[in-house]
A protein has these predicted regions:
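The feature captures the conserved acid-bearing segment of alpha/beta-hydrolase catalytic domains
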Residues: 177-289
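Active-site glycine-rich loops that stabilize anionic/oxyanionic intermediates
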Residues: 55-59, 189
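Conserved alpha/beta-hydrolase
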Residues: 79-94
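Gly/Ala-rich beta-loop-alpha elbow adjacent to hydrolase catalytic centers
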Residues: 153, 157
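Structural cue for short, hydrophobic secondary-structure segments
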Residues: 51-56, 86, 249
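A domain-start/cap signature at the N-terminus of enzymes
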Residues: 1-50, 58, 62-83, 111-122, ...
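Alpha/beta-hydrolase active-site loop
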Residues: 103-142
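C-terminal catalytic histidine-bearing segment of alpha/beta-hydrolase fold enzymes
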Residues: 250, 264, 281-325
Length: 325
């Protein structure tokens, strides 16, 4: 199954999603649709791993659910005991087209990728929704043998996974009760930098001239103007915990098209590099320079472009999602 560029880069005014996920999770006063590979309303003692897969900008959770299932099939016995979870972050156009109930959470076309508040029914962050999923997994009556949780995304979903690894609170709560948590960030268009430095042509880093792009360091590209979800968190206090979390970056070796329609070509994104592969490798080098003991890992998947299904089914993808050797 090919998950390609349009996952992240549909034009403004995009059409509604074809399918609404069939399960529901209350989040505050709202409701989040999602796909589940097993009914979690009954105890699931056989589940030892939960894999949360985040869709791209098209919000096509059905496509990503199928891709997650294909990856699990490819992982074979390594995926035994896995619960697959694919939440769906809807837009207003989806709610109107499908005549969904007024309590269905929905965001603007892009705001959910940065953890911004929902448009309705309440200003609930997409990160609040991920917190709610992780809180559900903490229920030891429902998941008595759960040992690990993976939060993975490709393209626009990779942006969510990355930024949730920076700001999210749910993962630390899981770790506090003894569960392992990993974030898998595949082929996003941009990353969060912790200071005004950006890559230079000689492979180093230097303070980026703000006059060339006044918003280059604003959230979601930098730490200025964090979303309400962050609360009183000081940007300087976020970096060290992030560097210590288990994060895996996956980049397609062929995801190098500077003119690919879905590529974020804003000046803030362009300040990070010419294409996704370059941006990802530069960001990893940036983190390594700042944190020699960085807990993060990275892998390039040769011959794969902007294709989420192929990324997840690759050897590095199966290792990241299911610990397949």
């Amino acid at each position: 199954m090919m998950l390609v560029a349009a996952d992240e880069g549909y034009a403004p005014g995009e059409s509604p999603v074809r399918v609404i996920a069939d399960a529901r999770l209350p989040v505050g006063t709202g409701v989040l649709p999602l796909y589940l590979s097993q009914d979690w309303d009954v105890p699931l003692p056989a589940v030892t791993r939960a894999v949360i897969v985040l869709h791209g900008r098209r919000r096509d959770a059905d496509t990503y659910y199928a891709a997650a299932q294909n990856a699990a099939d490819a992982a074979g016995s390594a995926a035994r005991g896995s619960l697959l979870i694919v939440p769906q972050f809807l837009a207003g156009v989806d709610v109107r087209h499908h005549r969904l109930p007024p309590d269905m959470l929905h965001w603007t076309l892009e705001s959910w990728m940065g953890g911004e508040p929902a448009e309705a029914p309440a200003p609930i962050s997409s990160f609040d929704a991920l917190d709610a999923i992780l809180a559900r997994l903490m229920d030891r009556a429902g998941f008595p043998n759960l040992r690990s949780v993976v939060v993975a995304g490709h393209s626009g979903g990779g942006q969510v996974a990355h930024r949730y690894a920076v700001l999210g609170r749910g993962g630390d709560r899981l770790q506090a009760v003894g569960l392992a948590v990993r974030y898998v960030v595949a082929n996003p268009s941009s990353y969060v930098y912790f200071n005004p430095e950006r890559p230079t042509l000689d492979g180093g880093f230097a303070r980026f001239p703000a006059a060339r792009c006044p918003g280059f360091d604003a959230w979601k590209y930098g730490m200025n103007g964090l979303p309400p979800y962050a609360g009183a968190a000081a940007p300087a206090a976020l970096e060290a915990p992030f560097a210590g979390r288990q994060v895996v970056y996956l980049w397609g070796g062929g995801d190098t098209d500077r003119d690919q329609p879905a590529l974020d070509r804003s000046c803030a994104a362009a300040a990070q590099g010419p294409h996704r592969l370059a941006r990802g490798q530069a960001y990893f080098a940036y983190l390594k320079a700042r944190h020699p003991d960085l807990a993060h890992r990275a892998a390039v998947v040769p011959g794969v472009g902007h294709d989420g299904g192929a990324m997840f089914r690759s050897a590095p993808g199966l290792a990241a999602l299911f610990d397949k050797n």
